[in-house]
Amino acid sequence: MARFSGKVMLISGGARGQGAVEARLLVAEGARVILGDVLEAEGAALASELGPAAQFFKLDVTKEADWARAVAAAEALGPLTGLVNNAGIYVPKLMMETDAALFERHTSVNQLGCFLGMKAVVPTMERAGGGSIVNISSTAGLRGSARAFAYGATKWALRGMTKSAALELAPRGIRVNSVHPGPIATPMLDIRTPEENAARLTSVPMGRQGTAEEVARLVLFLLSDESSYMTGSELAIDGGATL
């Protein structure tokens, strides 16, 4: 039997990149998936590609009402047992180049959005008998990131939120773990020049970018019962960059 047969998963930032790869793998393993994103055309196209096992809902992760609608849609399909907090923004700037508006934009999407998502799914996961939440952080949440000050601050916050939520939710049968990707070939990094990406790889012992599928397979492991004794963990998938 497929690992996720009969289960429902909710992915924020699910319209493209890493979220889309996660959705494809989950559907292939029997899950029904709610794709949440602000990218309506891309999200609708992906849902159409995946067929009846996937639905797209416009989800602005900074709005509680959007989360409530997405969770209700997921619960209508069956027991919601998995959430991937994948939505995020990345605008690399030094601290002295970062204004308050840019900092608040990062905290709203990357940090507040994650909090609202976790809070929204807890009641339905409890009704389902438990579940798994995977928060997508970054290696910027494991070490300093001078050139991406606001982004790094929010990814450190996700790391701490994950551990605190794991402590609170373990008695309710809900596991919470964080994934910390290094340089991954996704649309988020398209803002960098090829030269910038090549320079970054000099600090990666494995000498290459990771793929969205490599990260997605780790996410599926954390969503599955194969990781049933893991909570509060922070897993780097970075080619050795944080060694």
What are these regions (language model features)?
Residues 118, 154, 162:
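Active-site helix of classical SDR
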Residues 94-95, 99-104, 189, 197-200:
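Substrate-binding pocket helix/loop in short-chain dehydrogenase/reductase
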Residues 123, 167-168, 228:
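Alpha-helical segment proximal to the catalytic Tyr-Lys
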